[in-house]
C-alpha cells in the first residue's frame, strides 16, 4: 500500500477510532455501575462516569474495548447507510453546469514569459512547452480557428502568433500580404525567410518535389499527393483509370529518381517522357522511346521498382494505354506552362531544414483561383513526412526547433493526405498544425468522415464570429447549458381576480445559435480541452511587442520580395560549406 493511500484511509477512519477509544470509558462506567434493573444501573452510572474519566487514557478491559468497538463500528455503518441512501442534489446545476472560464482556469496553462506562449485571445495564452510543471496541464499546440469573412482571422490571430518568433513557421498566405507586412519583422528577429509564390512565379523561390524523394515510399507519397489534388470536378467513375494513371506516374517518377541525373529529376523531364510515349492502336508491337528505356532497364535491373510498375502499366491494350496517357497529360497540364516548369526545375526551399534553425516559409496562393494550389498541398505533405522522419532518425524523436504550420484558408489548398493521422502524431515531434477556416463545413467537404477526427485532435478551438448554421449549431451544443432562475407572474381578472408569482429553475444554452450569430465583433470564444470555455476579447495586434517591425506600423517596413530573392548571399564567420571538385563529377 502506498503512503498516499495509507494517509487517505487514516483520514477516513480516524474519527471513528477516536470515538471508539472514548466509548471505552463509557464501557468502564457501565461495568462499575451497580443495580440489577436497567433503571437502577443507569442512575448508578451517573456516579461512575466521573470515576471512569478520571484517567484520560482509554480503558483496556476486554468488555470496555468491546463497547468501544461496537460504538465506532456502529457510527461508521450509520454514516455509510445514510450516504448510500442520500438524495443527490446539485444545487444551482439542476439543468446544467456550464459557465464561462476565468483567469484562474487558464492560469496553469500559461508560461510566465509572454514570448513563450501561443496567443489565443487577449487574455488567454497557451505555453509552448510540451512538459508543463504539472503533466495534467499538457495540451497539444494544434489550433482550429473558425471565423467568417472579415472576422479578423489574419489580423487578430495569425499575425500575432507569427510575431511571437519562438518557432519556425510555415504560413499559408492568401493574396501574398502577410509576407509583405511581417517579412521584415522575421528578418530582424534572425529568421531565414523563404517564399513560394503560386500567383507570380517570378517572385518565388524554386520548389522541386523530386528533391525530397529518397525511397520508393517517398515516390508513392508524391504520386498520391499529385493524384489527390489534381483531379478535376466530377472526375468520379471507374477507378480503373485512376489506378492506371497511378501505375504509370509511379513508374516514370521511379525511373527518373533511380536512373536520371539529378538535374533531370523534375516535372519538366516527366512531361517530356509522357510526350514521347506514342501509342499505335493498330500495332501492338510498336515501341516508343520510353518503352526502349524500360526495356534496357529490365536487362540491367530485372527487379527494379520502376520496371515492375511499368510492366503492370503495359498490360493495357493500345487503345486503353492511349486513354491513360491522355488522362495523365490532362492531370499534368499545369506543368506545360514554362514558368511553372522553371519554378520546379530545382529546389531552394530546403523543407527538411525547418526544424534545424528558425525559418519562416511563406506559401503565397490565390484565394480566387485554385489552379496551382496543389503545389501548396504537396509542400505540406512532403514537409510533414520529412520533418517526422528527421525527428525520429536524427534527433531522437523531436526537432530542436518547433515547427508551426499556420494554414490560413485551409479549405482552399486542397487535401493533405492522411492529415487526420498526422495531427495526432506530430505533437511529439515538436510540430503543430493550425487550421484557419471560414466554417467547419469546409473541413467536412474536403476530408469527409475524417473531419471529426481532425477536429478532435485540436486541443484549442477558437470561434471569431460567423453565421454558418452548422458551425453555430455545433458550437452552441459544445458550450452546454447553464441553470438559470425564472420569475413568472400571473394576473387573473374577473369576478374573483387573483395575482401570483412563481420562481423556478430552468436550463438555457450558455450562448444560443441566434446569440452566436450576433456575437460582438471584438469578442471571440475559446475552447481549450478540459477547461471551461472563455468569452474574451480578440488580441489587439497593435499591442504586440514586435508590431513596430511590421508594415502595418510603418510602411517602410514593407518586405520587398523581389529584392530579397535577388540579394547576394553573404558568408558569415562559422558558416560551413561542402567543397566539390567539378572535374570529379560524373558526366551527364
Feature annotation, model-predicted:
Residues 1-151, 155-158, 202, 481, ...:
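Basic- and hydrophobic-enriched, low-structure N-terminal and domain-boundary segments
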